[in-house]
């Protein structure tokens, strides 16, 4: 299904080759460091470092912009409010801090395959065994959810069509109730199918 | 009744089976997908893209009211894990680790206790949770807890004071109140059409069926 591939940009840069766990740990350290950096000059250096990292990764300007784009108005509003309540340097540093943290997180997303991140998460889930949770069931839960998204989306399209046929396009209730009931029916049939294939034995 | 044909059920197998049976895996994954799909029709932008108003919080409240406490929290957790892994499952096709570094991170994390509290209050209502109880559950879990988690994080990220952030967030309150009412109406309608959508009824049926 389109749109479920994530934002990964293929490439062979050193950032692409780093293991997912290392990148996530690095991201956590960098985001904490950003919160501690106060003077605008230090944040300007951080901005240069982030830009250099993007250049090294070679993901391209379009992909980079797509990561930061969703917060552009927010950054502008934050800058304006900070300019009023604080001063110029405060406004610059707090806006930069937010944008840089998002850009760094976006860089990890752009250079890491979804499958690699999922594999890393599954390894992290392994200790769940000691809490009585089966890591296999948890990873089944994740992949079953991915599979269910197109199924439920298809169900939503059918409900929309039925709604149009009934002439109740404007009623949110006439959309949501059949959708939720349909999703539940599908879920319970799926659960029985899994049980019938011996998942609970 | 459990029929085991060819192999004995060992002690290691028992706990995991009790904790996450096939029926729960199916319901949790389909509801996580439902919350994702409710983000598809597009977001109603009030404030640019700051904290988009979406139908996804409606999905969170519905998950709580229908799946019960821990299953709904698990459904939200599964969705957030997939989002963190880079899948564009949030409203407007957002996804990736960036959303957890952004100003609305706290609202997303707040979905977890929010769904759980909604489920907990509905579960206290037993086999026939009333409309007022459902509404209270959606308001407390889907609005109260989510704001309680979201506002401090937004204040921390933006460096604005708590009061100013709360004032900014208040613009979303009318939309969220409407969504809580809508969630109540939809959950009631669903439970009337499909009684198994009431957490207590579902649990009783599982117990009676021995599964």
What are the functions of these language-model segments?
Chain B
Residues 4-15, 37, 97-146:
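Short helix-perturbing small/polar motifs within transmembrane alpha-helices
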Residues 42-117:
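Alpha-helical membrane segments and adjacent membrane-interface helices in multi-pass membrane proteins
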Residues 20, 24-31, 53-60, 72, ...:
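Residue-level signature of transmembrane alpha-helical entry/exit and packing/kink sites
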Residues 49, 125-211:
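Membrane-embedded alpha-helical hairpins and interfacial helices in multi-pass inner-membrane proteins
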Residues 17-21, 50-51, 91-92, 96-97, ...:
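Helix-boundary and loop/linker segments of multi-pass membrane transporters
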Residues 3-7, 84-89, 158-163:
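Peri-membrane helix termini and adjoining interfacial loops of integral membrane proteins
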Residues 2-73:
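Hydrophobic transmembrane alpha-helices
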Residues 30-38, 60, 64, 75-83, ...:
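Alpha-helical transmembrane segments in multi-pass membrane proteins
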């Amino acid at each position: 299904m389109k749109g479920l591939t994530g934002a990964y940009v293929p490439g062979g840069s050193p950032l692409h080759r780093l293991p997912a766990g290392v990148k996530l740990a690095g991201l956590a350290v960098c985001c904490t460091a950003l919160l501690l950096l106060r003077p605008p000059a230090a944040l300007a250096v951080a901005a240069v470092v982030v830009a250099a990292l993007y250049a090294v990764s070679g993901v391209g300007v379009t992909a980079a912009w797509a990561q930061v784009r969703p917060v552009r108005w927010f950054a502008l509003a934050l800058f304006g409010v900070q300019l009023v309540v604080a001063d110029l340097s405060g406004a610059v540093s707090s806006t930069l801090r937010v944008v840089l943290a998002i850009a760094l997180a976006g860089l990890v997303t752009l250079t890491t395959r979804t499958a690699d991140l999922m594999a890393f998460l599954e390894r992290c889930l392994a200790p769940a065994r000691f809490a009585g949770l089966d890591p296999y069931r948890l990873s089944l839960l994740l992949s079953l959810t991915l599979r269910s998204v197109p199924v439920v989306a298809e169900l939503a399209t059918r409900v929309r069509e039925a709604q149009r046929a009934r002439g109740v396009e404007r009623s949110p209730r006439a959309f949501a109730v059949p959708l939720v009931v349909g999703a539940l029916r599908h879920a319970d049939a799926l659960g029985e199918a899994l049980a019938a294939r011996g998942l609970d034995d | 009744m459990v029929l085991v044909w060819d192999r004995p059920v060992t002690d290691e197998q028992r706990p995991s089976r009790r904790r996450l049976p096939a029926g729960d895996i199916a319901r949790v994954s389909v509801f996580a997908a439902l919350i994702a799909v409710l983000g598809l029709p597009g977001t109603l932008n009030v404030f640019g893209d700051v904290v988009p108003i979406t139908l996804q919080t409606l999905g969170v409240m519905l998950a709580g009211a229908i799946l019960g406490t821990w299953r709904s929290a698990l459904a939200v957790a599964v969705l957030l894990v997939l989002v963190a892994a880079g899948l564009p499952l949030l409203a407007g096709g957002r996804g990736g680790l960036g959303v957890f570094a952004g100003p609305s991170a706290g609202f997303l994390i707040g979905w977890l206790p929010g769904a759980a509290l909604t489920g907990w209050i509905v579960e206290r209502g037993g086999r026939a949770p009333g409309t007022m109880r459902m509404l209270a559950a959606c308001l407390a879990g889907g609005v109260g807890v989510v704001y309680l988690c979201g506002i401090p994080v937004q204040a921390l990220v933006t460096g604005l004071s708590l009061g100013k952030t709360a004032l900014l967030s208040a613009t979303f309150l009318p939309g969220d109140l409407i969504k809580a009412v809508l969630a109540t109406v939809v959950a009631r309608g669903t439970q009337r059409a499909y009684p198994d959508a009431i957490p207590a009824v579902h649990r009783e049926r599982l117990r009676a069926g021995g599964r």
